[in-house]
């Protein structure tokens, strides 16, 4: 059994990003599983405030001592906030990936898009099969 958390109020991509929808604002980050797989994160590239994300497209990169990975948008919308703490100290994502370790806040175009992402149980089945 996995020791990773998969909060039920989030939706997930099989590429290990999550989205939390609160009204028309979506919070985007990466999962605890992804943080574990990456190891020590050393660099994070995120879009600027005002940039448009398109669901399924790459919006940034995360670099660790093990790998460089693309970050994929789970939803379409405009970036309204980015976590500047992670820009300065990208390794802070490991401390609280579902809380203080979020990457972006996005004003969504269509909140129903979130339903295309995996539920916590579906995501758990994906990662435990890896």
Curated annotation (Swiss-Prot):
Binds 1 lipoyl cofactor covalently. Belongs to the GcvH family. The glycine cleavage system is composed of four proteins: P, T, L and H. GO terms for biological process: glycine decarboxylation via glycine cleavage system. Its cofactor is (R)-lipoate. InterPro entries: 2-oxoA_DH_lipoyl-BS, Biotin_lipoyl, GCV_H, GCV_H/Fam206, GCV_H_sub, Single_hybrid_motif. The glycine cleavage system catalyzes the degradation of glycine. The H protein shuttles the methylamine group of glycine from the P protein to the T protein. Keywords: Lipoyl. It comes from the Bacteria. This is Glycine cleavage system H protein. GO terms for cellular component: cytosol; glycine cleavage complex.
